[in-house]
């Protein structure tokens, strides 16, 4: 599920970056700085997803109920932390972008990519990774149920 969210984040960011470059909004090219931007996005996205998944893991033994309810409560518990860290990161990267916009240097593209990546990563850690986890877990449980039924026959 985390890999699904990670691929989502990278592809959406890459798409926005391609649109911005094509429309001459920013200057960016494949360079070490752009690779660093995507590695930053990957790290940020994984960290956010791990925080949510860790809370789900902590809540599963403590809470009774459907997995969907546990996931929902876990997202609600981590929501403030996720939003605060995202806003803090966005503020600093937005300042970096504002200071470099129009300069046509590598930091302009870096800041733009990280801004898009942080926004998309924050969204996906809650609304892509968690539903994907639920879907994968339900499939796993259904397969385990089918295997038990086949064994009993």
Spans of model-derived segments:
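Membrane-interface segments at loop-to-transmembrane junctions
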Residues: 1-5, 71-78, 149-153
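Interfacial helix-loop-helix hairpins and adjacent transmembrane helices
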Residues: 131-153
């Amino acid at each position: 599920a985390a890999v699904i969210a990670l691929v989502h984040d990278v592809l959406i960011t890459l798409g926005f970056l391609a649109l911005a470059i094509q429309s001459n909004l920013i200057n960016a090219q494949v360079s070490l700085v752009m690779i660093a931007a995507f590695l930053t996005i990957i790290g940020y996205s994984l960290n956010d997803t791990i925080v949510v998944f860790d809370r789900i893991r902590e809540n599963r033994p403590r809470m009774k109920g459907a997995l969907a309810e546990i996931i929902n409560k876990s997202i609600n518990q981590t929501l403030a932390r996720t939003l605060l860290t995202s806003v803090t990161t966005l503020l600093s990267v937005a300042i970096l972008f504002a200071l470099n916009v129009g300069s046509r240097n590598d930091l302009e593209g870096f800041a733009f990519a990280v801004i898009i990546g942080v926004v998309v990563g924050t969204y996906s850690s809650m609304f892509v990774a968690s539903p994907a986890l639920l879907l994968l877990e339900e499939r796993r449980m259904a397969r385990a149920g089918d295997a038990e039924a086949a064994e009993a026959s």
